[in-house]
From Swiss-Prot:
Keywords: Aromatic hydrocarbons catabolism, Isomerase, Plasmid. Catalyzes the ketonization of 2-hydroxymuconate stereoselectively to yield 2-oxo-3-hexenedioate. This is 2-hydroxymuconate tautomerase. Pathway: Xenobiotic degradation; toluene degradation; Xenobiotic degradation; xylene degradation. It comes from Pseudomonas putida. GO terms for molecular function: isomerase activity. The lineage of its organism: Bacteria, Pseudomonadati, Pseudomonadota, Gammaproteobacteria, Pseudomonadales. Its EC number is 5.3.2.6. Pfam families: Tautomerase. It catalyses: (2Z,4E)-2-hydroxyhexa-2,4-dienedioate = (3E)-2-oxohex-3-enedioate. The gene is xylH.
Amino acid sequence: MPIAQIHILEGRSDEQKETLIREVSEAISRSLDAPLTSVRVIITEMAKGHFGIGGELASKVRR
């Protein structure tokens, strides 16, 4: 069972996350010739104050 773990900054809509899960699952299924029903996707959302970009908090870099 392939498992993809994706870390993203908070703020995406449920629709965007659903699209991400669907498209990642389809890509994994295709590339590994695995049944789509066996693919798992875990999304971990991070607060912008808990992630750094270029030495700065993401909350300061991305508004």
